[in-house]
Amino acid sequence: LVNGAGVTTSPATTLTFSAGDNLVQGEVVYVSGTYVLPASAASGVDPALWNPIGITAEAAVAAADVDVILDDIAIVSSGNIVHQTALTPGQYYYLANIPGKLTASTAPSGITTSGLYGAMTPVGLALSASELHVEIGSPVTLT
């Protein structure tokens, strides 16, 4: 960003938070107070869970510091993805109805109200089988 005086600033792409629970690397998280917790797009949960801020850069135990990738490349594993063993390059991924997980819109269950989803929240674009460019979008409430 460049202001009127020609001074350039770059927003942070990673921030450090306190883990509100035990977290694994590549987990999709939202902020609650001063803690980050696993986000979920499930129906019947507090809509705050539908608003992820990023993906954890490393594993952390509850109350420990954890870096969260807000807008950069995150490494995710098969344990972070629903119905897939790896990311599909070029595929967009969304917040799953399972806390902290990602799903492709083409997953077998899809993202529908019949799949117990309350919202569809874009999280990022797969660059490789394990790299996701984090691009958090606004949740779309499903009715």
Feature annotation, model-predicted:
Residues 3-143:
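Glycine-anchored, exposed beta-strand/edge motif detector
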